[in-house]
């Protein structure tokens, strides 16, 4: 990958408590918030963005007199490609950087490209469950494959990339580590993702929540690497924390953390009741249940797998509770019936 200056440079702006933020656009989802700290010997980052965003990250750092080589520490909230895939090439441009992540993540992921191919297949399996119309299914799978090929091609074009995910310092739940000039505490916060952690600066009460909560909403990938049960547990755990600032990886800072976390828990309950109510009226499939609960707008902007995964996680919970049964068709398509 040739690292060049983009046409529009995202600013590296200070947002209080000696925290900086860079908003990196990406081709398939909402822009990523990269949080930074200026230390005596360089920079500490929380997440580093999509592989294609490296030039924008470099250009933004340059506006404050820094370069990629000034990056000394990178803390990863989790291993989704819009947060961590840039690390596959940053190892060459920031050779002294130390990478931090959840202990199980490195061994669990291994070859990052191979792990993303499994993720791609899981996405297609979810589409197969949801779309009963073969023509519509083929169209959505073709679009999905095109997006994934674009990602793989970005790595193939670089001569400095390494597909093996590297974690130098493994993190466990409730670890406290001095990184750069600050003391961080880490909370293991699964639900959105199996390896998700939340870095905390206890001195300021700043919690960097990754993808746990995005603009009062949630993202659970269900069949891929998320868990509705874990997510409920994580939200309850966060409600016990002395959170003063909740800084997500997408969107604006959460203004009222406790109220928002409580609202997300209530929203999940409302969605569950909505699924039951609609199945009382008639059997339905995943696509129609998702559109009734969230709306058709999610078909645009890369949100479709997230929305389907969220509703499917609710359906599986209700199946385990004996409230719903699944009618499986030969092609993988599923229709859901309310028991009784």
Regions found by a protein language model. Give the residues of each.
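Metallo-beta-lactamase
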Residues: 43, 50-52, 149, 158-162, ...
């Amino acid at each position: 990958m040739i690292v060049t200056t983009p046409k529009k440079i995202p600013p590296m702006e200070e947002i209080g408590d000696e925290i900086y933020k860079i908003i990196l656009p990406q081709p398939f989802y909402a822009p990523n918030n990269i949080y930074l700290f200026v230390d005596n010997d360089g920079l500490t980052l929380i997440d580093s963005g999509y592989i294609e965003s490296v030039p924008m990250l470099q250009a933004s750092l340059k506006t404050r007199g820094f370069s990629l080589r000034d990056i000394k520490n990178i803390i990863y909230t989790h291993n989704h490609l819009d947060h961590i895939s840039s690390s596959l090439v940053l190892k060459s441009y920031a050779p002294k950087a130390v990478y931090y992540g959840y202990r199980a993540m490195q061994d669990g992921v291994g070859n990052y490209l191979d792990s993303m191919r499994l993720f791609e297949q899981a996405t297609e399996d979810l589409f197969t469950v949801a779309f009963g119309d073969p023509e519509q299914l083929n169209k959505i799978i073709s679009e999905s494959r095109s997006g994934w090929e674009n990602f793989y091609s970005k790595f193939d074009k670089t001569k400095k990339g390494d597909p093996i995910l590297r974690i130098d310092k493994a993190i466990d739940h409730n670890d406290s580590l001095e990184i750069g000039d600050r003391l961080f505490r880490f909370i293991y916060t699964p639900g959105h993702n199996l390896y998700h952690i939340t870095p905390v600066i206890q001195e300021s009460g700043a919690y960097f929540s990754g993808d746990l909560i995005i603009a009062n909403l949630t993202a659970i990938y269900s069949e891929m690497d998320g868990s509705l049960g874990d997510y409920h547990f994580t939200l309850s755990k966060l409600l016990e924390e002395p959170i003063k600032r909740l800084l997500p990886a997408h969107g604006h800072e959460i203004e009222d953390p406790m109220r928002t976390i409580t609202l997300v828990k209530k929203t999940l309950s409302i969605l569950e009741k909505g699924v039951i109510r609609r199945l009382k009226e008639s059997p339905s499939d995943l696509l129609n249940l998702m559109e009734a609960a969230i709306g058709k707008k999610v078909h645009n902007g890369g949100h479709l797998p997230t929305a389907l995964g969220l509703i499917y996680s609710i359906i599986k919970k209700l199946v385990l509770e004996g409230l719903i049964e699944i009618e499986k068709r030969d092609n993988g398509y599923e229709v859901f019936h309310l028991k009784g």
